[in-house]
Regions:
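Solvent-exposed, amphipathic alpha-helical "stalk/arm" or coiled-coil-like segments used as scaffolds
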Residues: 46-60
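Juxtamembrane interface at the cytosolic side of transmembrane helices
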Residues: 4, 226-243
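Soluble oligomerization/assembly scaffold segments of membrane-associated complexes
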Residues: 56-194
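Flexible glycine-/small-residue-rich
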Residues: 12-16, 108-110, 119-121, 199-201
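Interfacial amphipathic helix/helix-coil modules
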Residues: 180-222, 235-238
Length: 243
């Protein structure tokens, strides 16, 4: 029989933190040759969603949570805490492939824009824990990215400020530096920087597969088949005895 698989889901709302403060500098050409100055680095919903399912992010999550022995339990010797000698040691790519295709599922509601992150696993407690930890990690990573980018932007703007004597440009740069400082302050104050949790994952009570109804139906069919086989065998035995 197939082992039961449980599905834990968390409902998320993307948080938009895009920085629109570059407008005053466009007319002065300050942004020329400097990519990414106008973005927050962590608040773009599409980028955050892409990061959530990316290989780099997933590899880091698997390593941080120590999931390699869990994902490949049949190859892991729990007693010696080493990979079995007669089994091929899985690679990071193997782990990403399994996690991305069989464990983690992400869907977006076109009408509402809400995102459902689901984890399917044999242990309901682990499924809910991984789902919630993924959200915590993506929020922390996007928040850190926003802070790093804003700090880089500020350093660049200070260089530009030292190279210009145009009063209007200086004022515009000061405004943008102020906006970048605000971006850092906002990022540091928000735990849910990229995704707001509407409904956190909880350990599911019933497996998503195999379903109980299907098990019952298969059990009935198997019982009928077994009964038919018994009847046929007895009938054949009775015919042989009569001969």
């Amino acid at each position: 029989l197939l082992p039961p698989v449980y599905r834990a889901e968390t409902l998320l709302a993307p948080v938009e933190n895009s920085d629109k403060s570059t407008g005053p500098l466009l007319s002065f050409g300050v942004l020329e040759g400097f990519s990414g100055l106008g973005t927050s680095g962590g608040g773009d919903a599409a980028e955050a969603l892409a990061t959530l399912t990316s290989r780099v992010f997933t590899d880091a999550f698997i390593k941080e949570e120590g999931l390699m022995p869990v994902l490949f339990a049949e190859r892991w010797d729990a007693a010696t805490r080493t990979w079995k000698a007669d089994a091929e040691m899985p690679t990071a790519w193997d782990a990403y492939d399994v996690f991305n295709r069989r464990v983690r599922f992400v869907s977006k509601d076109i009408k509402t824009g809400l995102i459902t992150l689901a984890i399917e696993w044999r242990d309901p407690e682990a499924a809910s824990r991984w789902a919630n930890r993924l959200v915590q990690r993506i929020n922390a990573e996007r928040r850190a990215a926003a802070i790093r980018e804003a700090e880089t932007n500020i350093a660049y703007l200070k260089e530009q400020l030292a190279e210009t004597s145009i009063v209007e440009m200086q004022q515009a740069i000061y405004q943008l530096i102020e906006a970048k400082i605000k971006t850092i302050m906002v990022a540091k104050s928000l735990d849910e920087y990229a995704f707001k949790v509407i409904d956190p994952a909880a350990p599911p009570q019933d497996p998503v597969r195999p379903r109980r109804a299907a098990i019952v139906v298969l059990g009935v069919l198997f019982g009928l088949l077994a009964s038919a086989v018994v009847v046929l065998v007895r009938h054949a035995s009775a015919r042989r005895r009569r001969r």
